[in-house]
Amino acid sequence: MTSWADIQKLASDLQRVQLSQSSKKLSEVNCIEVLQKLIASHRIDVVYTRDGHSYVTKNHLETEIKNECIAAGGRASLTDIAVALNIDFDHIEKTSRLIVSTDDEFTISNAEIFATEYVHRLRNELRTLLDEQGNQTTAALCKHWNLSSELLQSLLIEKLGSSDFQGVVDGDTIYTSSFLNARQLVLRAILIALTKITPISTIQKRVGLTPKRFWIAFENLQSLGEIPGTLIGSRTSPSCSYRPMMYDHLVKSCVLNQYRQNEFLEISTLKTLGVDAKPALEEVLGSSEFKKLVSMRSMFMTKELMDQCINAVQEDLQKSGISDVHLALQSLNLPLDTADEDEIGSKVANVEKDSHFAEGFVFKGAVLTEALRSIDKLLDVRAHEEVDRLEAEKKKQGGAKAAVKVQEETDDWGDGKKGGKGGKKNAKSVKGGSKSSAPSTSSNLSANISINSEELEIWLRESQSVPEEILSVIVEKLNQETTTLLRKKVQDIQAHQLVASVANSKKSLSAIGDKCRQLYDSFNTFETATSTFADPLGSDLRQYLLKTVGNEIALALLSYVMGVDNAHQLKEKQREETIENLPEMLRDPIRSVFASLKSTDDDALDKFHDAVYNCSAPSATSLALKKVDKKGRAEVGAKITAELHEQLCSQTEPATTLLLSVLYILAKAGRPTTASGKFVSQLVAQIKDLCPENVFDLLQACQKGVVTCIKNKGDEVAKEMLVNDISSLKQSIMP
């Protein structure tokens, strides 16, 4: 910088020039010319003002800029300096950057130049603010001083580590040590004053520290042993809470006082206190007291209080035989929920003999007995109605002609596959003989007898023997029992009617005996015809014969020894019970007949004949069943042929008509056979020599048509062709 001596020298030179003669002075034009030559020769470095009338050296410009900055308080805008000095902004900015690069006491940022004096003033002002408030954020300081955060950081905050600053810079906040110490003491006071579990977020908000400074203060207190409590959960969790020791003491006192006063503890209260877990409760009460508690859904209670609850319900139950658990427990004034009351009701039902619990009521078995007694007359009326219905259905079944049975599986009419053995569940058959076509075993009609819950509820409501509150419960418990009782009454009535009909048993026995003989004659006739077919067809037909006609013979024999023609109505279990109750001389032969039906050995028919012979011996039924001779077989065959002819005349269903046609041709040829639809394809191949060629062709066409219609039920063209072929077949084989 220019010294005072230089200034004095310039002043003396100026005075000397002013005192010289005019001839020795330079005119303004000469001065300008001289300066231009000096500038052109780079002898001097100057900067012109904006109007071009003045100039200043760069060194002097630096001095002017520094003076302007200091005059503005240490902070001046480059734009304001350019206006004040009347110099272009670019020269001002360039010179300012040169100043900053050479002088550490100045800095530039955002088109502003700052002097060290300004930084000192900011530091003093910051110290004052911190002394007043204890902390300041950089955002607030930036707004207060109109500085950018980066500039504030570089000018002030980064230089606060000196010994004259007693504080901490944490992130974007500046704290004084005294402020942090005061906040730590506030935290200590809060932690000591708390008596309940409090979220850490609430405590932190009250202390007024950032999470980082809060946990630093917390750890400082913890290291000093000044934390009278524990943390619940992770520090980083939003649900982290503080549990003071005083809270544990108060909770324990509260739980113990409630337990001693009430003899129960509500789980909702324990949850609020944070001791709902069994280990925590055991720690509060002690192991011995905890073992005395009865755990329920909404509370823990002592065994003595549970006994009081049970006794209250028992006393109410003894009065009327019915107890509303909720009302019975009201006198104890306990906050029980429905699940607790149900548990107590179940305990009472287990303790009280012949008691039941349902829908909040405990009631004695006598209530059920009285309810049944009140509807006994209604059950009697219903039983007679059911007996009449069963008799009507039985007569309807017995009066209807047995329909011709046709195999329903789609592969039964196939192209020559081996026929399945007789007696399959879904196999249907056609067999000749006027008496040999008895219906197969039907389901026991009495199994359909029942009383639905709606009807039972109406009966009980009308009888007024059951309180409305437990009516639905009684209905549910008695539903099966009333059905069983009704069936027993029906059986008793049927048994009574059976005894009344014993007078007509002789005629019935004679008819059943004739039926047995006719069935056995048909069986022998069919068996003889099966021997004309080669195996495996012959063996399959014999097995089928055994499962169908043989089964009917066995049922007829059982009906004969029972004296009532209803063996076909019995289920297998009932049939076995009936056989078991027969006298020994009848039981073993009848059982042997049924056992032979299940045999699949080659000698199954021989076993069946032996069993039938033993059953018809004088020591058993005295029916004297025997194999029919050739003349007898011819008579039976004629009857079968006549019946098949009659059925063919009335039959219109194509599949059944085809089966009847095949059986009719075989019967006319002296080979009467019983078979189902699955044997049709094999039997057609066997009768090629028994009928004219055109009939055989029609049989094959019909057989293919039946298969096509079964597989393609919507094919109307195939159905029409089949109907035409069946019509032609009937006309061809019937005279």
Curated annotation (Swiss-Prot):
Belongs to the UFL1 family. It comes from Caenorhabditis elegans. Its EC number is 2.3.2.-. It comes from the Eukaryota. InterPro entries: Ufl1, Ufl1-like_C, Ufl1_dom, Ufl1_N. It is an enzyme of class 2 (transferase). The keyword Transferase applies. Keywords: Transferase, Ubl conjugation pathway. Residues 429-445 have a biased composition (Low complexity). GO terms for biological process: negative regulation of NF-kappaB transcription factor activity; protein ufmylation; response to endoplasmic reticulum stress; reticulophagy. One of its GO terms (cellular component) is endoplasmic reticulum membrane. This is E3 UFM1-protein ligase 1 homolog. The gene is ufl-1. Residues 389-445 are annotated as: Disordered. E3 UFM1-protein ligase that mediates ufmylation of target proteins. Residues 419-428 have a biased composition (Basic residues). GO terms for molecular function: UFM1 ligase activity; UFM1 transferase activity.
